[in-house]
Amino acid sequence: MAYAVIRIRGRVGVRRDIADTLKMLRLHKVNHCVIIPETETFKGMLQKVKDYVTWGEIDKDTLVKLILKRGRLPGNKKVNPEIIKELTGMDVEELAEKIINGEIKLKETPLKPVFRLHPPRKGFERGGIKKPFSVGGALGYRGEKINELLEKMM
């Protein structure tokens, strides 16, 4: 399984250790998204930055859409299925399946590891960006509902 992690809050007033963890996750700016494997190391990092990001399990269909719509190659070149087939030797669905299953990491592909997303259409949840998802906000773990947020942000 793989997590999609999206940075929600900015960098003003962030403690140094949390800023370092966000940097290790490659979440430098708001609305940036990374796909990470579900390991104990990453889970600990997510717990540390839970007040600045939201995350959940991404499904294959959403990852395919994310790669095709917001994926970029070095030089900020757009991605299409033919380019992915040519560079990786597999189609987009197969690539997404392997990323989700943890067989390959996104950084091992020619794609950039960070997806730059738009702010969500119709905004975040009613509670805003300072409350956890469990009480109606936007932060922290949200499970399968990350796919709905990603759809709003693509």
Swiss-Prot record:
GO terms for molecular function: RNA binding; structural constituent of ribosome. This is Large ribosomal subunit protein uL30. PANTHER family: 60S RIBOSOMAL PROTEIN L7, LARGE RIBOSOMAL SUBUNIT PROTEIN UL30. It comes from the Archaea. Pfam families: Ribosomal_L30 (PF00327). GO terms for biological process: maturation of LSU-rRNA from tricistronic rRNA transcript (SSU-rRNA, 5.8S rRNA, LSU-rRNA); translation. Part of the 50S ribosomal subunit. InterPro entries: Ribo_uL30_ferredoxin-like_sf (IPR036919), Ribosomal_uL30 (IPR039699), Ribosomal_uL30_arc (IPR005997), Ribosomal_uL30_CS (IPR018038), Ribosomal_uL30_euk_arc (IPR035808), Ribosomal_uL30_ferredoxin-like (IPR016082). The keyword Ribonucleoprotein applies. It comes from Methanocaldococcus jannaschii (strain ATCC 43067 / DSM 2661 / JAL-1 / JCM 10045 / NBRC 100440) (Methanococcus jannaschii). SUPFAM superfamilies: Ribosomal protein L30p/L7e (SSF55129). NCBIfam families: PRK06049.1 (NF004711), uL30_arch (TIGR01309). The keyword Zinc does not apply. Belongs to the universal ribosomal protein uL30 family. Keywords: Ribonucleoprotein, Ribosomal protein. GO terms for cellular component: cytosolic large ribosomal subunit.
